[in-house]
C-alpha cells in the first residue's frame, strides 16, 4: 500500500437517479460501483476515503416542487416533452451541489457516482459554489448538450452540459446554469450527436473530439489536446459516461452505441489524466446493473477511477 500522507481525502457521494433517461435501472449504479470494491481499491492505492452515502432522489409521484415553480408551471413553459421530471432532477442536483461544495471547500476530491448523467449539473454547480471553475473533459458517446428547445426526446440526461455551459434557460434555475466555460470544455468519444447539439457545440466553443478523430489521431494525441484545453481551467473535472466505451467492453449502460473506446484506450485516457496532475474531481455516470453482465461495467468503472486518481496530486 502506498503512503497516504499528503494525499487528499476522496469523498464519495452517490446519486441513485434514473429520472433523466427513459430506461430504468441506472439508479442502482452507485450500489453496483460500490459493490465492485471501489473503497478498497482506492485505499489500496494510498487514499483516505470517506463515503457520504447517497443523496435523496424524489420520485415524481411525490409531487415535490422546487425553486417556487410547480410542475404545472414547468410544463406550461414549453409545448411537448421538453424536460421530463425536471422538478425532481433539479431538487436532486441542488442537494448534490451542496455536498460537492462542502467537499471541494475542504480541499478534498469529490467522487460522484451515478446515476444518470443529469447529475452533472449538480456536480459542476457545487464546484462553482466552492469557487472552482475547472475545465471539463466530458467523455461520452453523446454530447449531452441539448436544451429544452433542441431536444428530440425531452430526456434531461441529454442536457446537463448545455445547462452547465449556460446554453439552457428555464426551467433550470440560475444557480445550475453557466457553471463552466466552453473555452475550457472538451467532449471526447462522440459518435451519436443530435442536429441541435452540433449547433450548441459551436455556439459554446467546446472542443469536440469524435471517435473518428480518435481513430485518425490516436487516443494519445487526442487526449493530449483535451488536457491542454481543459487544463487551462481551475484544474480538470472528469465527467465519464460509461457509454463512451464500446458495448463489448461496457454492456451495462442505458444508451449503448457501437464503435466506442476500447478498454485500453479508456485506460490510457485515465492514465494521462493522472499523469497531468490536474484532475480535481470525478463523476461516473450511466452504470446500469440491470443491463450489465456479472457487474462487468461497474467493475470497469472502478478500474478507470483508480487509474485516473492513482498519481493525481501527490
Regions of interest found by a model, annotated:
Residues 2-17, 23-111, 123, 129, ...:
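Catalytic cores of soluble, metal-dependent hydrolases
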Residues 3-6, 128-131, 153-154, 176-180, ...:
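Solvent-exposed alpha-helices and their adjacent loops that cap or buttress functional pockets
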Residues 105-174, 184, 276:
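Active-site histidine-anchored catalytic micro-motif
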Residues 115, 139-141, 188, 238-242, ...:
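Active-site flanking residues adjacent to catalytic metal/cofactor-binding acidic residues
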Residues 119, 141-145, 192, 242-244, ...:
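Short, glycine/acidic-enriched loop or turn micro-motifs at the edges of active sites
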Residues 168-169, 186-194, 220-222, 262-267:
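A general structural motif
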Residues 178-188:
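Alpha-helix-centered segments that form part of catalytic cores
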Residues 193-203:
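Short, glycine/polar-rich helix-capping loops at beta-to-alpha or helix-loop-helix junctions
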Amino acid at each position: 500500500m502506498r503512503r497516504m500522507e499528503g494525499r487528499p481525502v476522496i469523498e464519495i457521494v452517490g446519486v441513485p437517479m434514473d429520472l433523466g433517461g427513459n430506461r430504468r435501472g441506472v439508479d442502482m449504479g452507485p450500489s453496483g460501483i460500490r459493490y465492485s470494491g471501489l473503497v478498497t481499491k482506492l485505499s489500496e492505492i494510498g487514499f483516505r476515503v470517506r463515503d457520504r452515502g447517497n443523496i435523496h432522489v424524489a420520485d415524481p409521484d411525490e409531487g415535490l416542487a422546487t425553486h417556487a415553480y410547480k410542475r404545472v408551471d414547468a410544463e406550461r413553459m414549453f409545448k411537448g416533452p421538453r424536460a421530463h421530471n425536471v422538478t425532481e432532477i433539479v431538487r436532486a442536483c441542488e442537494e448534490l451541489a451542496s455536498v460537492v461544495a462542502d467537499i471541494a471547500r475542504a480541499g478534498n476530491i469529490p467522487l460522484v457516482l451515478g446515476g444518470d448523467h443529469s447529475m452533472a449539473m449538480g456536480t459542476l454547480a457545487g464546484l462553482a459554489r466552492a469557487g472552482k471553475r475547472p475545465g471539463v473533459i466530458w467523455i461520452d458517446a453523446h454530447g449531452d448538450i441539448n436544451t429544452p428547445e433542441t431536444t428530440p426526446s425531452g430526456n434531461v440526461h441529454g442536457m446537463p452540459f448545455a445547462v452547465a455551459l449556460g446554453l439552457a434557460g428555464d426551467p433550470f434555475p440560475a444557480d445550475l446554469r453557466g457553471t463552466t466555460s466552453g473555452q475550457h470544455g472538451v467532449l471526447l468519444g462522440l459518435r451519436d450527436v443530435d442536429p441541435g447539439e452540433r449547433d450548441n457545440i459551436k455556439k459554446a466553443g467546446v472542443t469536440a473530439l469524435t471517435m473518428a478523430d480518435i481513430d485518425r489521431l490516436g487516443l494519445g494525441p487526442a487526449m493530449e489536446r483535451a488536457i491542454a484545453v481543459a487544463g487551462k481551467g481551475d484544474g480538470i473535472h472528469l465527467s465519464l459516461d460509461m457509454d463512451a466505451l464500446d458495448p463489448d467492453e461496457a454492456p451495462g449502460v442505458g444508451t449503448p452505441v457501437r464503435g466506442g473506446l476500447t478498454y485500453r484506450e479508456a485506460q490510457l485516457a485515465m492514465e494521462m489524466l493522472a499523469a497531468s496532475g490536474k484532475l480535481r474531481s470525478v463523476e461516473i455516470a450511466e452504470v446500469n446493473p440491470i443491463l450489465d453482465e456479472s457487474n462487468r461495467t461497474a467493475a470497469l468503472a472502478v478500474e478507470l477511477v483508480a487509474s485516473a486518481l492513482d498519481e493525481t496530486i501527490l
